[in-house]
Amino acid sequence: FMSIGGEDFPGIDFAWDWGNSTKNISWRYIPNSNYLITTRLSKTKYNFNVDFEMDFNPDSVSSDTSDVIALNEESSDLSFFLDNLVEDIDLNQSIKYILSDHVSFESGWQIKTLKLDYREIFAEQEVTNINSKPQIISTFVNVTLNPIPIIYYNIGFRLSKFNRYDDLILNPKMGIKYNPISDLALKASYGRYSQFLYTINQEEELLRIVDFWQPIPEDKKPQEADHFIIGAEYWISTGNTISLETYYKSYSSIYDLNPKPDYTDIQNTFALSGTAKAYGIEFLYRMNRKKLNGWLSYAYSNIKRTVDLNSDGIIWDEKEIYPAKYDKPHSFNALLSYQINKKYSLGLTTVFSSGQTYTPVIGKVHQTGVESYGSIENPYTNFGNIYGIRNGSRYPNYIRTDISLSIKSNLFGLDSEWKFQIINLTNNYNVLLYLWDHTASPSKVQAYSMFPRIFTFGWEFKI
């Protein structure tokens, strides 16, 4: 729970409650060294809710040290409540059989039953209430072949039945690994993958801490993608490897939020179907040089979605072909650890990536309607945003460096470790969001950053 505000800042009450629980039972049967049967039954329950209230003119009582905000249901100007419940019951069984040193076989089945409840209340009015019980029944077969020592084949498929879609879903896959020399592996693979749920997180949300999920609309094709991957891995020495991989993904079916759903039929109009394409290249270097170890990575990616957002049957290239929210063309990561001696060790983490995409504000408009009306003297006190291309702009590059020091100790007879860390060592201003003030003329925009330089410490011990 958080409550902030006072003086010229709106009063805000923010309550955030979440939790999950998992129960699992499994049984393994091994009749001989070549034969293994595994059976599992699990139940997972996940609940997340947010209660948000804002008062643009809070009653403040000032003191020398703080402002006390009087904010309650009667005085709040804006309220929002969200509740998301997910229950997942999963029963599955797999059978693995090693026929010989050159052939192994694996098969199995799965029954997954879900219960999904999602509800939104805005300004004390329920705007979204979706309840569903999707079920997926599937079976799979996978064969690994090693006809000669330098070549491996992996071939298989998964056959699924989704209770909200009439047709059976077939997902084939195949892969090959070739070792021309003992220290080099060349790899290629293809696979078709289906997903029966899609995320419904709002594009404008500030922090995507968790994903909210809903099943594919009734009688609609599940999300489907074909993955093509080619790569190589080279073992320089013990603990030192280099890998390079390139990929192309073609999505024949995806779902994105409908900007104008029909709230009388929210279940079937909450999302719009479309297509997408993604490609990229990834480089990874793992190092282990006595006292210095860690890894360095670089990735380039491009992800574009195509969705008929206005549902007119025509794709508008400028506004309906757009980057995904998580599209970051360039990403560099480094994680290094240096062992000074048996007691002390240093750590360094560096991240550089392209900024996250966002939908830009390109103008403002007077809000209409009784709720947005100001007063007789000043009727146009409320403004709304005019948005540009979805995810058409990008925040500045994200740069962050963290350092840490670990000290091993034996306190109270416990093997433990003291950990000290400085987050965002360079105090780089990484933009979290832009907030527009349309009451000014011309409108003004204020950038808000993520966390500044932060010092943390902790004590980790083993019992």
Predicted segment positions?
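Structural signature of Gram-negative outer-membrane beta-barrels, strongest in the C-terminal barrel
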Residues: L41-S42, V86, I98-E106, Q110, ...
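Outer-membrane beta-barrel signature, preferentially recognizing the C-terminal barrel domain
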Residues: E7-I30, N84, S132, Y193-Y251, ...
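Repeated loop/turn-to-beta-strand initiation elements of outer-membrane beta-barrel proteins
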Residues: S33-I37, H102-F105, I150-Y153, D183-L186, ...
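C-terminal beta-signal and adjacent terminal beta-strands/loops
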Residues: K343, F352-T381, P396-D402, S406-I463
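Surface-exposed extracellular loop regions of Gram-negative outer-membrane beta-barrel proteins
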Residues: M2-G5, K115-D117, N163, D183-F228, ...
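Face-selective signature of the C-terminal outer-membrane beta-barrel domain
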Residues: F1, D17-D166, N179, S243, ...
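Transmembrane beta-barrel strands of outer-membrane/channel proteins
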Residues: T39-K45, S107-T113, I155-L159, A188-R192, ...
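Gram-negative outer-membrane beta-barrel transporters
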Residues: I148, Y247-S250, A271-I362
